[in-house]
Amino acid sequence: MEEREGTNINNIPTSFGLKQHETPLPPPGYPPRSENPNLFPVGQSSTSSAAAAVKPSENVAPPFSLTMPVENSSSELKKKRGRPRKYNPDGSLAVTLSPMPISSSVPLTSEFGSRKRGRGRGRGRGRGRGRGQGQGSREPNNNNNDNNWLKNPQMFEFNNNTPTSGGGGPAEIVSPSFTPHVLTVNAGEDVTMKIMTFSQQGSRAICILSANGPISNVTLRQSMTSGGTLTYEGHFEILSLTGSFIPSESGGTRSRAGGMSVSLAGQDGRVFGGGLAGLFIAAGPVQVMVGSFIAGQEESQQQQQQIKKQRRERLGIPTTTQASNISFGGSAEDPKARYGLNKPVVIQPPPVSAPPVSFSHEPSTNTVHGYYANNTANHIKDLFSSLPGEDREEDEDDLEGEDDEEFGGHSESDTEVPS
């Protein structure tokens, strides 16, 4: 171990690029050796070399010595390569940084971070080989990020902004098809009339979900008694109240169809109930939970109307539209006018002149056939003529002349015969 330390000390580079050769320290009890050994030793015996070290000869060049600080082997410690850690193993920030300089020529200063500059790139800079200055290891950051959610006070807060219904109105957030309501009936008022009045305010159907409160007078439907009803007077508590009223239309008149049933408890604990058939007087404040909704058939009709209305608004069609006939340049009765055939092409048949009543010879079938063939050919030529003005008149004159010559008649007699 001492030999390794000695070799390390001997090979310390100087600021002049030379290596300082120093002999190992002598053991205790021996005289110290000279610090200026002979730079040019000669291969002699140990005694001659020692004498030459004490008294150099005249032929040898004068000695060359360097005076520079030499570090003790005891202060020599094993240095760790790389940049020092910014964080301790426990995750705390290492504030005191005291790195050792690389060489003895570098001045020893306490501000190590100011002279050392990271080779990495910062934000907005070019490429670099490593992380920028001031960036530490990622492990403590990951631990801090993992524990940040514990420090967030909103993480353990519950949402207390739940919608609550008011004292006598609908809830704040409700569905359009079902809306809850709370009705309050004061003492001495009829609960049944209160519910019926509420149901007639709109076109929606209602259902009674529950009720609570004291009752002083109630009339129930009893089929076993005379008259079919039975009235109870006293102090009773409402256990349950259910029922529904759905709008109906018959013969052009709209009405409400439905009913309610109640269960009551007397002061002695006996329970009775039945369908309400009359008075239902409250002895104190009574709260009734009612829900309004749209009936199935009415809901489907309203949805269809709403869908149609939305489609009309998208297309830009007014709400009250009448059926309009789309015409293509003509009336709806004329099918040709729909396709723009306002001026139909009419092919006029050739003038057919009947033979006179009295003539000297009988026409043969060959002459009649040749007559129609000639007239048809001339008529087709007339249709495809380039000048329909003068040429058509000349062709008609020629046809009339040929007809007169063939049948031997006059033009006046030919025009008098209907075609």
UniProtKB/Swiss-Prot annotation:
Ranges of biased composition (kind: Acidic residues): 391-406
DNA-binding region residue numbers: 78-90
Source organism superkingdom: Eukaryota
Keywords of the record: DNA-binding, Nucleus, Transcription, Transcription regulation
Low complexity biased stretches: 136-148
GO process annotations (BP): xylem and phloem pattern formation; xylem development
Keyword Flavoprotein: no
Short motif Bipartite nuclear localization signal, span: 78-86
Entry GO MF terms: minor groove of adenine-thymine-rich DNA binding
Primary localisation category: nucleus
Gene Ontology cellular-component terms listed: nucleus
Residue segments, region Disordered: 1-168, 301-337, 382-419
Pfam families in the record: PCC
Xref: InterPro entries: AHL, PPC_dom
Tissue and organ distribution: Predominantly expressed in the stele of the root meristem with a specificity to the procambium.
Location in or out of the cell: Nucleus
Polar residues: compositionally biased ranges: 101-112, 318-328
Residue ranges of domain PPC in the record: 174-314
Disruption phenotype: Misspecification of tissue boundaries between the xylem and procambium.
Gene3D superfamilies referenced in this protein's UniProt entry, alphabetically: Hypothetical protein, similar to alpha- acetolactate decarboxylase, domain 2
Positions with biased composition (Basic residues): 115-130
Domain-level remarks: The PPC domain mediates interactions between AHL proteins.
Function: Transcription factor that specifically binds AT-rich DNA sequences related to the nuclear matrix attachment regions (MARs). Acts redundantly with AHL3 to regulate the formation of tissue boundary between the xylem and procambium in the root meristem. Cell-to-cell movement of AHL4 from the procambium to the xylem is critical for its function in root vascular patterning.
Subunit structure comment from the entry: Homodimer. Interacts with AHL3.
Stated name of the protein: AT-hook motif nuclear-localized protein 4
Lineage per the UniProt record: Eukaryota, Viridiplantae, Streptophyta, Embryophyta, Tracheophyta
